[in-house]
Amino acid sequence: MLRWTVHLEGGPRRVNHAAVAVGHRVYSFGGYCSGEDYETLRQIDVHIFNAVSLRWTKLPPVRPAVRGQAPVVPYMRYGHSTVLIDDTVFLWGGRNDTEGACNVLYAFDVNTHKWSTPRVSGTVPGARDGHSACVLGKIMYIFGGYEQLADCFSNDIHKLDTSTMTWTLVCTKGNPARWRDFHSATMLGNHMYVFGGRADRFGPFHSNNEIYCNRIRVFDTRTEAWLDCPHTPVLPEGRRSHSAFGYNGELYIFGGYNARLNRHFHDLWKFNPGSFTWKKIEPKGKGPCPRRRQCCCIVGDKIVLFGGTSPSPEEGLGDEFDLIDHSDLHILDFSPSLKTLCKLAVIQYNLDQSCLPHDIRWELNAMTTNSNISRPIVSSHG
């Protein structure tokens, strides 16, 4: 019984950030926030959400080991990717308005909170943003995005073997997925499932004739071939900047945006790779408002969703150029316990808590007390 169980405000106000779950914690890296100074080059920030205490913390800036020497830290960026392999978060790609796009690989140790730049070899992908990254074993797969130097969309697949730190441009077989950015790629078993994103009628080149494909594409990592997929009768609307995650062997997508329809979404869809069918899911409880550019991470049987941007609710500010960046966080529970359901009832009906054990009262307080590290709301345009 899927249910939205937690909604808290006051976290990091971010869009186009990247995040990974490490145990019961979620690490969020960078992103964009309207009103912040992006002309000054500065370190990427790291926020950590504790899924037990439901609190956010922010790591302090990295100090140089040698006075006068800049520390090895990625610059603040958006449209990048992060994956977790063992105890290391690998951050790749992304851009900011001063430095442009980046193709340097960064490694973040979740135990020491230290950054490094591993020495890599092979065919390094060109600098880009809006790509996807997913993991199979020790290998990170990068697909698509918008390449800065070529000034075009990509449909290449690169893989990084983190045991040897070797990049490889995959020579794929079959009919490849269309050039795109801000799509999703999710690894289920040995297959990478690509959905959505922004493409163009002129192929790799951006002409403002956007296409939002809603057919899923599947890449087999064993044969390195794009598979021919059957048509499905029920499909979600095409979209970009949505979230996707795998749970119990199935693929889920949430939210996103379609510029041709000028519509933000807050729907949840489930894809079954066995039957190759989509189903719209209607969780219980109050979920997030329509949005794009948010992050989703799996923590046990829960999905932690935070950030993103939505149309301003103010009158006359409804189009895509008037957006409000979010500092909220929502938790979607795939299997809420009886204890969780009882706590939700206490909150909903404002029941007396004085007779409850201290730990239950602490948990109720955590579920209803907002964080306080977000910036003030500023309307963004774009």
Swiss-Prot record:
A single GO BP: ubiquitin-dependent protein catabolic process via the C-end degron rule pathway
Localization, UniProt: Cytoplasm
The keyword Cytoplasm is annotated on this UniProt entry: yes
Associated pathway: Protein modification; protein ubiquitination
One protein family per Pfam: Kelch_KLHDC2_KLHL20_DRC7
Start and stop residues of the Kelch repeats: 25-77, 88-138, 139-189, 191-249, 251-301
Keywords: Cytoplasm, Kelch repeat, Meiosis, Repeat, Ubl conjugation pathway
GO cellular component: chromatin; Cul2-RING ubiquitin ligase complex; cytoplasm
Predominant localisation class: cytoplasm
GO molecular function, one term: chromatin binding
Keyword Secreted attributed: no
Protein's job: Substrate-recognition component of a Cul2-RING (CRL2) E3 ubiquitin-protein ligase complex of the DesCEND (destruction via C-end degrons) pathway, which recognizes a C-degron located at the extreme C terminus of target proteins, leading to their ubiquitination and degradation. The C-degron recognized by the DesCEND pathway is usually a motif of less than ten residues and can be present in full-length proteins, truncated proteins or proteolytically cleaved forms.
Quaternary structure annotation from Swiss-Prot or TrEMBL: Component of a CRL2(KLHDC3) complex, also named ECS(KLHDC3) complex, composed of CUL2, Elongin BC (ELOB and ELOC), RBX1 and substrate-specific adapter KLHDC3. May form oligomers as a KLHDC3-ELOB-ELOC complex; this interaction is likely autoinhibitory for the E3 ligase complex.
Protein's UniProt name: Kelch domain-containing protein 3
Organism annotation: Rattus norvegicus (Rat)
